[in-house]
Amino acid sequence: MSNPMRTPMVEKVIVHMGVGESGQHLVNAEEILKTITGQEVVRCFAKRTLPAFSIKKNEPIGCKVTLRGQRAQEFLGTSFEIIEKTLSRAQFDSLGNVSFGIEEHTDFPGMRYDPNIGVFGMDVTVVLKRPGERICKRRIATRKIPTDHRVTVDDAIAFLNESYGVEVM
């Protein structure tokens, strides 16, 4: 695009592992996520009690990391290589964000299978934005983002194809 204010960019990448239980299994997932991303991990807690899964309210059941800037770019490059640079159009939401899953953490470079730890999968969510989105986040003179300035699905697909060579089926 010729106008730099219309060019989409990556705001953040969220990597999430839903383990479903606390204890050593969750600690192993946190260590794997910290190794893969090189960043501190935050725990996710259950919102309500689910007796069928023996989950109590406020029990830690997952972990996540939010990546921004250069780390997000590097992680996305590796992640798209793992999923062979193919996405489905159904993986995009109406705001141009995209989510996809990685089935095994052992697909990442430098990660090997350890029978004591097991295999973990993860969810990756990419949030895209355009320059000028600060107007909806600032404290003074907050405004809505105009409809024509929001990132659409087609804009997101074009950006990912151009920047990372991702094909959308």
UniProtKB/Swiss-Prot annotation:
Coiled-coil region(s): none
Origin superkingdom: Archaea
Pfam families per the UniProt record, alphabetical: Ribosomal_L5 (PF00281), Ribosomal_L5_C (PF00673)
Gene Ontology molecular function terms on file: rRNA binding; structural constituent of ribosome; tRNA binding
Gene Ontology cellular component annotations, sorted alphabetically: ribonucleoprotein complex; ribosome
Sorted UniProt keywords: Ribonucleoprotein, Ribosomal protein, RNA-binding, rRNA-binding, tRNA-binding
GO process annotations (BP): translation
Gene3D superfamilies: 3.30.1440.10
Role, per record: This is one of the proteins that bind and probably mediate the attachment of the 5S RNA into the large ribosomal subunit, where it forms part of the central protuberance. In the 70S ribosome it contacts protein S13 of the 30S subunit (bridge B1b), connecting the 2 subunits; this bridge is implicated in subunit movement. May contact the P site tRNA; the 5S rRNA and some of its associated proteins might help stabilize positioning of ribosome-bound tRNAs.
Family (UniProt): Belongs to the universal ribosomal protein uL5 family.
Subunit structure: Part of the 50S ribosomal subunit; contacts the 5S rRNA and probably tRNA. Forms a bridge to the 30S subunit in the 70S ribosome.
Name assigned to this protein: Large ribosomal subunit protein uL5
Organism of derivation: Methanosarcina mazei (strain ATCC BAA-159 / DSM 3647 / Goe1 / Go1 / JCM 11833 / OCM 88)
Organism lineage: Archaea, Methanobacteriati, Methanobacteriota, Stenosarchaea group, Methanomicrobia
